[in-house]
């Protein structure tokens, strides 16, 4: 099998443009997060989750209109598994689960089947928010320690900068578009951290090898060479991952749209940051 030719793209020479692009994205993301925040789902805000079954396919718009007319503001309705099963997310209600189920049946018709009713209290939602934030913090600290031991402090700070870059921009896009942020999206963010780190470490490994094998050469040339040598691997890994994620997004159903979207955004941003952000931080330090 014929080996692929190593490209000679001047990534390092274009790092100024990349830094400006990243700074703009981060600034917009932070501004959006500070002004309008994330649109948290009931996993974090508290509320009621109701799974409803129908004997035949149901029109979601009619269900939404029915709930809206009954003063259930902010009700989220989506298919769950098939077009005759729906999932309803409601804001916290001042009535019991039994009374709420009775009210929903009265609104939607006697032929519906209430499969389950789950209540998430505001306190539980607050605990999940705190735990989610701590999970990301612990992940970043663990990565900082791991990379510092495996490489050196410059590599460690470079990897953390790239990961924070990926997380902030992904959260910023969710804030800008006001896409619901629930536990599945949090799981996707943590997965993005792992994916981006793996990509970055592959690049760092090659940079370290090149520094050890090539003496008295401009660091920019060494890093540029490493980025070009790992480029085919980076592109092939990202493209195959994106193909799977696109299939999940378009064919996986509405229930996992946010999860798949977070991964799509994270993989694209993570691939970009492993090439430009992480390596730029090494040169800066």
Regions from the language model: what does each represent?
Residues 1-285:
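A structural signal for conserved, well-ordered secondary-structure elements
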């Amino acid at each position: 099998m014929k080996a692929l030719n190593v490209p000679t793209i001047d990534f390092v020479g274009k790092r100024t443009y990349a830094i400006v692009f990243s700074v703009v994205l981060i600034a917009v993301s932070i501004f959006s997060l500070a002004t309008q925040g994330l649109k948290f789902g009931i996993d974090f805000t508290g509320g009621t989750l109701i799974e409803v079954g129908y004997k035949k396919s149901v029109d979601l718009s009619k269900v939404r209109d029915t709930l809206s007319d009954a003063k259930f503001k902010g009700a989220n309705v989506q298919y769950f598994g098939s077009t005759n099963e729906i999932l309803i997310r409601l804001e916290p209600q001042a009535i019991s689960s039994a009374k709420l189920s009775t009210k929903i049946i009265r609104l939607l018709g006697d032929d519906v089947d209430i499969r389950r009713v789950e209540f998430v209290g505001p306190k539980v939602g607050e605990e999940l928010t705190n735990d989610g934030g701590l999970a990301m913090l612990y992940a970043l600290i663990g990565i900082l320690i791991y990379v510092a031991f495996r490489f050196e402090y410059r590599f460690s700070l470079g990897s953390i900068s790239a990961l924070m870059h990926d997380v902030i921009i992904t959260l910023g896009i969710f804030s800008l578009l006001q896409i619901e942020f629930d536990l599945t999206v949090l799981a996707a963010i943590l997965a993005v951290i792992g994916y981006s780190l793996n990509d970055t470490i592959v690049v760092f490994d090659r940079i370290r090898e090149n520094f050890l094998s090539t003496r008295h050469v401009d660091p920019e040339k060494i890093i540029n060479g490493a980025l070009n040598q790992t480029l085919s691997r980076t592109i092939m890994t990202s493209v195959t991952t994106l193909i799977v994620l696109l299939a999940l997004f378009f064919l996986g159903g509405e229930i996992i749209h946010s999860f798949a979207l977070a991964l799509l955004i994270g993989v694209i941003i993570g691939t970009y940051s492993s090439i430009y952000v992480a390596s730029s931080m090494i040169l800066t330090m």
